[in-house]
Amino acid sequence: MSEDAVKNAILIAGPTASGKSALAIRMAKATGGFIVNTDSMQVYGVLDLLTARPSRANLAEAEHFLYGHVPPSSTYSTGKWFEDVEALLGRCELQGRVPIFVGGTGLYFRALLGGLSQTPEVSAQVRDHWRGRMEAEGAKALHAVLCVRDPAIAAALQPSDSQRIVRALEVLESTGKSLLEWQKVKGRALVDDQSAQKIVLRPDRAWLGVRIARRFSAMWAEGAIDEVRALLALDLDPALPAMKAIGVREVSAFLAETMSREEAIERSVIATRQYAKRQSTWFRNQLGEDWRVYASGEEVFQGGSFRDPQ
């Protein structure tokens, strides 16, 4: 642990639609703290509704940082988020206040507490080579290449995960070492693991499924169609992360009149439930035993479980 790691931070993890944002606001009010986005999709602009970013009313209740600050035309990495958090925590006006990290991206939480892996720079020539092959051959073909050259990391990646497959191949060619080996070398942590309050929400699965369905119907009614229309007007590369946000493909199909409203909503709800299941599985298997598990945000405040770090 780095000596200058922030002490007494609050970390709130959990699947989408589990009530994390409401809990974070309640904690910010109780502690005078500020909220930091810890979700890789909520960093992108334009998609306020589809990425379930805090509403204007939410933003008025507590200070929020690192939401919607990245243009959807960009690719935003864990490393860039780490740099942005480091700069944020160094701001004078935030010193002495409790940072409340809330979101559903496990790798962000891992970086906060354990530091970032010291992966090497890759030459433009190598990068262009593999990205060109990805564009020409597709993710499945390059995943097959990775299975031969680096089977250990290939087994850990989905065959459709084009960004991470290319990164693994780039690093292997540039250094002769697997990305897994580089990932073992950690940098400094930003948050002190020992003093942090680490909370993970694990709601009832049936309850979460109903909540997801209701939330997406509300998104549709509140303007998700207009969001996707605005995104499509930017004429972006379909491979960009923002273009892969749940709901974008379905609403796009509705706008193209190749899918009905009902089917677009149903498919988006199914995709969101599947995503929530993957998130829950990751948190269950990857977070340490010192993370306290709650069924809801309300439960955190019951029985004196929550302690004000101030």
Curated annotation (Swiss-Prot):
Cofactor dependency? Mg(2+)
Instruction: State if Cell inner membrane is listed as a keyword.
Output: no
* InterPro entries to which the protein is assigned, alphabetical: Dimethylallyltransferase (IPR039657), IPT (IPR018022), P-loop_NTPase (IPR027417)
Listed binding positions for substrate are 16-21
In chain numbering, the residues marked as site (Interaction with substrate tRNA) are 105, 127
Which keywords describe this protein according to UniProt? ATP-binding, Magnesium, Nucleotide-binding, Transferase, tRNA processing
List, alphabetically, the Pfam families matched.
IPPT (PF01715)
Tell me what reaction this enzyme catalyses: adenosine(37) in tRNA + dimethylallyl diphosphate = N(6)-dimethylallyladenosine(37) in tRNA + diphosphate
Q: What is its EC number?
A: 2.5.1.75
Q: Which residues bind ATP?
A: 14-21
- Cysteine disulfide links: none
GO annotation, biological process: tRNA modification
- Enumerate the residue ranges of region (Interaction with substrate tRNA): 39-42, 163-167
| GO molecular function annotations of the record | ATP binding; tRNA dimethylallyltransferase activity
Subunit info? Monomer.
- Similarity-based family: Belongs to the IPP transferase family.
Q: Tell me the PANTHER family matching this sequence.
A: TRNA DIMETHYLALLYLTRANSFERASE (PTHR11088:SF60)
The job of this chain, per UniProt, is described as: Catalyzes the transfer of a dimethylallyl group onto the adenine at position 37 in tRNAs that read codons beginning with uridine, leading to the formation of N6-(dimethylallyl)adenosine (i(6)A).
| Protein name listed in UniProt | tRNA dimethylallyltransferase
Species this protein is from: Brucella melitensis biotype 1 (strain ATCC 23456 / CCUG 17765 / NCTC 10094 / 16M)
Q: Which gene encodes it?
A: miaA
